[in-house]
Amino acid sequence: MESSSFLTVNDQPIFINQAVKYLQASGKLAHFIGDILRQYVIEQEIQTRYDIAISPALTEQTIIDFRLKNQLNDPQIFQEWLQKNVTDYATFYESIAFSFKLEKLKVLIAEAKISEYFIERKIFLDRVIISRIVVDNREIAEELQTQIEEGGSFEQLAKEYSLSEDRMVNGMMGPVSRGTMPDQLRAVIDIANPGQVVGPIEIEGRYGLFRVEQFLPASLEDTQLQQALQNELFEKWLVEKIQKLTVKLQMS
C-alpha cells in the first residue's frame, strides 16, 4: 500500500503508516479499526436499502434549528464554527442526514424482533421498589417481623437494626430489576402485594425482611425503553455483520 499523508503537524506530514504505528503504540488501534468497520457496515447497509429516504427539508430544518440554538445564525460566525470543527457545510449537512438515516435503520433492523426480544428481556426490565431490613441471624429477623406485625415502624426498625447501607434512607433500595434478584427473593416478591412485608429470607448468610413498595412493570409503550431495546438489537446485528468481514491491515 502506497503511504500517503494523513495529517500535517507543524508543516511536517504524518503518513498513514506512521499514524497506524502511533495507534498501535498507544493501544488504540483496535478501537480505531472497530470504528471504521462500524461505519463501513452501516454505510454499506444504507446504500443497499431503498426504505431509508430522508427528506432534504428535514435535514435543512435541523441545521437551521441547530444554528439558532447555538447562536450561529450569522453566516460568518457559522463559517468560523465550521472551520473550527474541521468541516464544511456539505460535510456537516451529510452528517446530519446520516444521523437521521442511522436512526431509521435502527428502527428497521429492530422492528421484526423487538416484541420477541422484549419478552425475553422482560424479567430484567420489570422493576420493583422495595425496602429492606438486613440482620445477621434469623432470631432477630423474626423478632423484628413480629414487631412490624404488631404495628412497629418498618422505617424506624430499619434505621436501628439493619446492617445494609440503605438503613440511612429507611431501608429503601429503590427500583430493583426482577432479573437481578436472588431466586428465593423474587419468588416471594412476585406474589406479594404493595405494602406487604415478606421474610425472613436468607441471602448470603444474612436474613432480610422486605417490604414491597411498588411494582414497575416494563412496557413497550415506554418510548425510552423501546429506544434502548432498538439500540441493543442494532448493536447485536452490527456485531454479527462485523464478525463476518474479512479484514486485512496493510502497511508499507
Feature locations, PLM:
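Peptidyl-prolyl cis-trans isomerase
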Residues: 2-252
